[in-house]
Amino acid sequence: MIALIVTINIKPGHKDAFMASMLDDARGSNKDEPGCLRFDVLQDNDNPNQIHLYEVYQDQAALDAHRQAPHFTKWRETVADWFDGEPSRKVCTTVFRAEDA
């Protein structure tokens, strides 16, 4: 499994529109992508314009499919000008899942 931890800073004045588009993408990822095992959207408690994503994919093919999904490409086009700097991304390998306890 591949896990991504993405941090996005949103330009002031764009948070509400960003979140509406972000939640559409998250719903599409969870609902329409069999290889997407988890897609969580988190708001930073100290910075309301900072969003963290926690995404888990079955494998590289599932991650590649996510990046080609219509809801993802629509999201990227919609929010591109609302990023305050480039998002940071950590790619991780899942070692243990709580569901496996």
Model regions: which residues?
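N-terminal first-folded block
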Residues: 2-32, 36-40
